[in-house]
């Protein structure tokens, strides 16, 4: 398995959109829709490759806190993870964890000290286990809804 950060090319864009379309079809996240070029452009892209084929991706962007809150100071830089995806047949094999770890090491080299992400999965117990127990993230907040 190879992990690397890549520039957006037409081929990579097409593969990312194909993966996100498959993810949309899984119906595993509330409100998830497949990505468009506009959703992906401008993000940093990290890939998991097996035999030169994309099997997972992570993309996100650098941002700064608009105002101080309980997690970061005003203007403190952080990396916001937009999406982390591994093909269904390869899940639970540590690929997502390794991909996240690769991205984290790259950010540490750049002196980035904070990573944020939100998730809209329907299987919150599994995803909290993954992010909290497997990746060592901390729980910040929860946004809940009830359709009536």
Predicted feature descriptions by range:
Residues 86, 92-105:
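Conserved acetyl-CoA-binding loop-helix of GNAT-fold acetyltransferases
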